[in-house]
């Protein structure tokens, strides 16, 4: 596995919601690992001429789960989250919905209300990624979230050598700018916000049977920088844009 710093630029913002009822769920500011795996699977498949998102009984994203071990994120500023946004047809002709049994017109809107939208105009997101995929796959990322969440990859740098170290429980780490799991820290000093996101779940890639129990995990997101004390042994990554911590087995 190698560690990369991937710099992404969003064109206008992004929406990262829960499949399958994605239009009526809130958006996440920090992408869950399942979203990252899906984005990289799509990038790799497109680069290799495989343009199939879903095949009955199989998922391309599921095959990439073992290739991504860890991901952490740094935001230039906190995106503005909107809880609802009306979706409407932009075609020439309005589509009208009818109740067939009653024979009555329901609405002239063809789509559901969309909940969850992060306004992040031309915003930069740095992604620290531990993976065995090629650098070309990382440069091929075009979206991170829903189909509207278009990104451009500005740069991909490999982090090596002395920039990756193991730190012991009780260590004081300064200049932390990347998101981290609450379980890794004993205390945090600085400005941050907490995002509760779904833990990795292979069942999300089964498009015909949804998971009944979804575990979540609290993620601390520095806004813009914090210092912390580790609650257990951890792995420290030093980058040009600040420090990141992760589980000790990454070292």
How should these model regions be labeled?
Residues 2-54:
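N-terminal ordered "arm"
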Residues 63-251:
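Internal, well-folded beta-alpha domain core
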Residues 22-29, 57-60, 87-94:
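Structural preference for beta-rich elements and adjacent junctions enriched in aromatics
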Residues 51-66:
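Short, glycine/acidic-rich hinge or "gate" loops at secondary-structure transitions
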């Amino acid at each position: 596995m190698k560690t990369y710093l991937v710099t992404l630029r969003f064109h206008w913002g992004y929406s990262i919601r829960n499949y399958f009822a994605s239009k009526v769920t809130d958006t996440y500011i920090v992408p869950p690992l399942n979203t990252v795996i899906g984005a990289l699977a799509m990038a790799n498949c497109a680069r290799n001429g495989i343009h199939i998102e879903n095949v009955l009984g199989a998922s391309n994203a599921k095959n990439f789960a073992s290739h991504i071990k860890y991901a952490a994120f740094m935001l230039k500023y906190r995106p503005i989250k909107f809880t609802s946004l009306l979706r409407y047809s932009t075609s020439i002709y309005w589509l009208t919905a009818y109740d067939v049994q009653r024979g009555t017109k329901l609405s002239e809107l063809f789509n559901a209300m969309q909940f969850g939208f992060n306004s992040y105009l031309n915003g930069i997101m740095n992604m620290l990624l531990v993976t065995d995929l090629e650098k070309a796959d990382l440069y091929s990322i075009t979206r991170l979230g829903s189909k509207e969440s278009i990104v451009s990859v500005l740069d991909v740098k490999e982090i090596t050598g002395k920039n990756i170290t193991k730190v012991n429980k009780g260590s004081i780490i300064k200049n932390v700018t990347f998101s981290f799991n609450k379980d890794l820290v004993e205390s945090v000093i600085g400005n941050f916000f907490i995002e509760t996101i779904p833990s990795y779940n292979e069942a999300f890639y089964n498009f015909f049977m949804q998971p009944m129990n979804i575990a979540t995990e609290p993620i601390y997101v520095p806004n813009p920088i914090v210092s912390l004390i580790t609650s257990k042994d951890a792995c420290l990554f030093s980058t040009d844009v600040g420090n990141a911590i992760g589980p000790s087995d990454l070292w």
